Amino acid sequence: MHYKKSIIGIAVTATAIIAGCQVTHQIVKSQGTAQGKHGEVQVETTFKDGHIVAIDVLKQKENKVLAGAVFKDVKQAIIDNNSIEVDGIAGATVTSKALKEAVGKSIEAAGVTLVATASAKKSEALTPAEYTYDVVIIGSGGAGFSAGLEAIAAGRSAVIIEKMPIIGGNSLISGAEMNVAGSWVQKNMGITDSKELFISDTLKGGDFKGDPEMVKTMVDNAVGAAEWLRDYVKVEFYPDQLFQFGGHSVKRALIPKGHTGAEVISKFSIKADEVGLPIHTNTKAEKLIQDQTGRIVGVEAAHNGKTITYHAKRGVVIATGGFSSNMEMRKKYNPELDERYGSTGHAGGTGDGIVMAEKIHAAAKNMGYIQSYPICSPTSGAIALIADSRFFGAVLINQKGERFVEELERRDVISHAILAQPGRYTYVLWNQDIENVAHTVEMHQGELKEFTKDGLMYKVDTLEEAAKVFNIPEDKLLSTIKDVNHYAATGKDEAFNHRSGLVDLSKGPYWILKATPSVHHTMGGLVVDTRTRVLDEQGKVIPGLFAAGEVTGLTHGTNRLGGNAYTDIIVYGRIAGQEAAK
């Protein structure tokens, strides 16, 4: 930890300090540093008469959306309570802890004794007991933002209510790659693709259990949705790079700047401010309001222990995501996915929208179809985005030093294959040549530090060293990689028929990561039509109620292909906003 101290105002002599003389109206500034999720967090704290009066963040590399909430709300709580013993932000615990530790170090550096105060309540404007909008959207992920912006564009008033203190949901913490057939990037790269092939891949990837019309609507509108993100929302995508996720026939997944959803959600937030789309955080939707005819006319929500009624003159859009973080719901619909499995999802993904809609007799379908993501942290369960090197040639190795599955297979296939290996884990191995193309280590330095600290990831110069750090039989690993290099040279993977072609791994340095599957996506959810209208248990439209994104249950079938979630949420989020605004 590094910190420094400066004193401004009345000079304090050594004698006065030793004697314990009290000096009033003294302003003290000091700095402190602590380790955040993606690098050091450095602050400068200003004290006066034993009180913290200001905290300035001098340096940080945290996720800009998560950091925004921490550096606003947690910082203010520290000032209000004159203490670092305050609650952090759910979903941003590491960043919250870093801020509090950095301020704590600055207190130590200043040598200031803070004045004890009664627990202060954060001053805030009185929250009205009710609001009225044309369209009320529940959830601030990609589907919710898309719906809200489209409602505003149609000339309607709209609001997004979000139960978490941070916007974005899983759309924020995902890689945010988006599959599109016929995108400008495919044209730049000379890749031939078609809507028909995209539809075929998606239906096959879900074992033909996905609804063909829902899939077709998603694919048909994908180009327009991506161009809307690029041109209207101002999301930056890499112009000359695409992912080919497992189950796809060609490279078709657009990659946002920074390789995470922070690029998308931050641009959504900026656009929402620009067009006057309010977002009410810490506001949990609890009940859908129906009139005498059965039409949905509003939402009852809770904020700081107070009930707030949101009247919706035209429609309510449910965009609350899935239930991967709700253990009881997971076990109810798929008992195998119990406490042994972590979750890649954010803490708020607990199925609230599904439960709320079922109470007014909305239909749900495919609830037992729950997907695991194959490459995640064995300690936290979080997805390992750094291992997206797999889409550029990284190989999967078991404890015996053998490959055991095609690296670009479907997520469910790879997950099951990993769980069948000794120890129920895999190693992901790649070299500098792959990193030069994938840039995953460069883009995910926070993960690199976290995985290295936990003993899950190493950078080594040779394959022999890679074998040694994880006690893999050296001779077997060398033999396996010799085969990989041969397959790369011939262009034919004789072992597992790698669909994109393997990459030569003869030159180091290498990165090797230990990983295991976690619950990732819930394919089941509310039954909707292609206009996103929610249907009841008799198959009839529930007037005034719409749903989009992971909360719905028809598009993906038994398994969602990588990169299809963002296509789904943006396409159907936009449709929901347009339909609700009519």
Swiss-Prot record:
Topology class, membrane: Lipid-anchor
Q: Does the keyword Membrane apply?
A: yes
SUPFAM superfamilies xref list: FAD/NAD(P)-binding domain, Succinate dehydrogenase/fumarate reductase flavoprotein, catalytic domain
Positions where FMN phosphoryl threonine occurs in the chain: 93
UniProt keywords, alphabetically: Cell membrane, FAD, Flavoprotein, FMN, Lipoprotein, Membrane, Oxidoreductase, Palmitate, Phosphoprotein, Signal
Q: Which reaction does it catalyse?
A: dihydrourocanate + A = urocanate + AH2
What Pfam families does the entry give? FAD_binding_2, FMN_bind
InterPro entries attached to this UniProt entry: FAD-dep_OxRdtase_2_FAD-bd, FAD-oxidoreductase_2, FAD/NAD-bd_sf, Flavocytochrome_c, FMN-bd, Succ_DH/fumarate_Rdtase_cat_sf
Co-factor(s): FAD; FMN
Q: Which residues form the active site?
A: 411
User: Where is the secretion signal located?
Assistant: 1-20
Q: Which family does it belong to?
A: Belongs to the FAD-dependent oxidoreductase 2 family. FRD/SDH subfamily.
What the protein does comes down to: Catalyzes the two-electron reduction of urocanate to dihydrourocanate (also named imidazole propionate or deamino-histidine). The physiological electron donor is unknown; it might be the membrane-bound tetraheme cytochrome c (CymA). Enables anaerobic growth with urocanate as a sole terminal electron acceptor, and thus can provide the cells with a niche where no other bacteria can compete and survive. Is unable to reduce cinnamate and other unsaturated organic acids such as acrylic, crotonic, fumaric and orotic acids. Has no fumarate reductase or succinate dehydrogenase activity.
Q: What is this protein called?
A: Urocanate reductase
Q: Which organism is it from?
A: Shewanella oneidensis (strain ATCC 700550 / JCM 31522 / CIP 106686 / LMG 19005 / NCIMB 14063 / MR-1)
